[in-house]
Amino acid sequence: MLFRSDIDPFYGAPDVVVVLADKSMPTYVYDGSLVMGNIMNAAADLGVASCWVHRAKEEFESEEGKAILKKLGIEGEYEGIGNLILGYAAGPAGDPAPRKANYIYMI
């Protein structure tokens, strides 16, 4: 079992998108991460909330995860980049944290 049965790692979200990337590509982690970010930006533009839920790498390295991929007909050397939950927020977003001073430098 990948998760404890008493925990919902996806916070009750109605939709979960799993991003996998082909490990034969030298930039697969960057490519998959960019896919995640672009989906999150597109969702926000449509008024849909999103959250990147980690552990996809570990999930699909497990025997249970490999069995899921096989059942779906996904063959090859893929690595889980992330799980992306999508839905409508239960309430308004809180205020953003203050920016860190001297965190970004202009050169």
Model-derived regions, located:
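Acidic, surface-exposed loops and disordered segments
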Residues: 1-107
